[in-house]
Amino acid sequence: MSSTSARALAARARGPRARSTRARRLGVFASTAGRGVSRARAVTRDDDASADSTLASPGVASAIPRYGEGGCFVDHCDAATVSRIREALLTSTSTASRTPAAGPGCLSSLTFAVKDNLDVRGARTGAGSPRWLAAHPSPAETSARAVDAFVNAGAVFVGKTQMDELAWALQGQNAHYGTPTNPAVPSLIPGGSSSGSAVAVAAGFCDLALGTDTAGSVRVPASYCGVFGFRPTHGAVSMLGCVPLAPSFDTLGWFARDAETLRRGGDALLPDDVVGVDFAFVRAAVAEDAFEACDGATAETLRRCVDRLAAKNARVFGAANRRGVRLGGGGGAPAERERDPSPDETRDARGLPAAPPLAEWWDAFRALQTREVWRALGGWIEAHDARLEGFGPGVRDRFCAARDAARDAKADPEAELRIVARAAATRDAAAARLRELTRDGAVVVLPSAPGPPIPRTSAAREVEAFRASQLRLTCASGFAGAPQVTIPAAALAEAEDGETGSGSAPVGISLLSAPGTDKALLALAVELTEEASSRRRG
């Protein structure tokens, strides 16, 4: 798709009212050195043309390719295919997937893209894998429920996006298709596995983009690309029509450049909150050990964000209602613990259930996820790539580990039961801890990622180490099945904070709440970032 045709499509989809000459700003990026923010240049859209949005430095986003190396859209769903699919979706999409909360036209005039592990009727689903694409040569006969919901709500489909191979990575790098260019800082990774969706939104190619999140695949790229991202309550949004990874952790998610658009996406996808429409958050728990897991500069930037949260909503985040907590216990890594904790050690100083340290959360998550992945995909892999020769580095290692774990389980069932039981106990303790921390209207504040994105040229060992540090933070909502919203740190900045230059890399802060409070959490994100959104609109 050419830049001209894509811009024309976006302009037609938005309608004449949205194609005004009013400037639109895509956001601001916080400096990881704690020196304020770098504000994006305003971009004007008019009836004749729709300029690509420019992010961290002039000309960066306009240079982001849509297809090919560095592009965020897949080649097997090209411009002609998109045009044909779009017309078919607009005329014949079933209304069966419309949620009770989705009013007709709640996404009218908005455009959206779809991660390539989600089915779109008339398009092939590649899941970031040439082997998967070759094994599934026929276009999907039906769309994923979430795609139908967006179309029924009035959104216009503009393409399918690149992703990490079979969604089992977090860096956004695909050995077969390349790495989508991060519009914020092109030399850094965009994050994954929903890399193309985050980039498409950040670059202004669409208003919303669907992704999936098993262990951070929406929250991490949202943080790295400087956009908003949402992982809903597990099971709140149907996963029908999605290539699975680890079903007990898999969720659908979505991206937007501002919280109001993110909320509108939730209106199309989410059922009503179980807590009712009058629910309000009343206090905050700041996860101190999660902040300690960040690099020093990121922790400093995000702690200033916590202060800004208090300035914007004292009812929830003010000193009287805010407290520091630890998600996990204070013990060392598993190898350093010589005994199981005594009953007295299972409660923290406030009498709340204690949980193992965050490092143990990640170990447990990895053990459970690895086994689920092989149950979900092992049969297909054995049939199509038994020697795992068609996978890229990192991803291949993880599938090898999953296969070996399955073989070991058959060879020694008792040992397997012990491994799974220990991991499940950690999961249950972590989930209980988060239930206590989010009860009665509390929201947990934690980093979306431990630092800014690393360079695209990083060595494999550095990539894997950074992935592990990310997962220590992101597995929390997976264990709890809880909703989590990623907010760009810069969206909380004050207008007078000024600019730090074009080299500033985005970082994100997250709010996590109890399962079933999704819409309330999205509304809180809108409230907290309303000032920044108004500046961008103005």
Indicate residue ranges for each PLM-predicted region.
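Short glycine-enriched, charge-decorated loop/helix-capping segments at active-site entrances
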Residues: 127-136, 459-464, 511
